[in-house]
Amino acid sequence: MSASLEPTPEQIEALAARPADQSVVMINLLQFRADRGRQSYLRYMQEVTPHLQRVGGTVRYAGESPAVVLGAGEKPWWDVIIVVEYPSPAAFLDMVTNEEYVKVHEHRAGGLDRGDLVATSIWTGAE
């Protein structure tokens, strides 16, 4: 399995150090494996739903990236972007460390060549 599909201990520590009373919005940039990667990831999406519900997570957006409108003009490396909001960093960590979730995660890891996950917060400057 690619190292980019699993967080480092330092990345987990950085997420856990975020404010506990603020939601965290995860930006998933996903590149599927050529052989049945999309199907494996779709199975993950179906099976992860109860785990998301248990911790209060919500999928806010899922979309494909067919073209760049502004920028270098090349097609992005990722196939799909999925945005998921969690009520807190602890909620996300609770989900991904759950024994039952770990079984479901196999479909995610098995379906991806690359899967970058960026933790973001609401930008108060935009309000």
Predicted regions located by residue number:
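Short S/T/G/P-rich N-terminal loop/turn motif that feeds into the first structured element of a domain
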Residues: 1-80, 87-94, 121-127
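Short, Lys/Arg-rich amphipathic alpha-helical interaction segments
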Residues: 83, 90-127
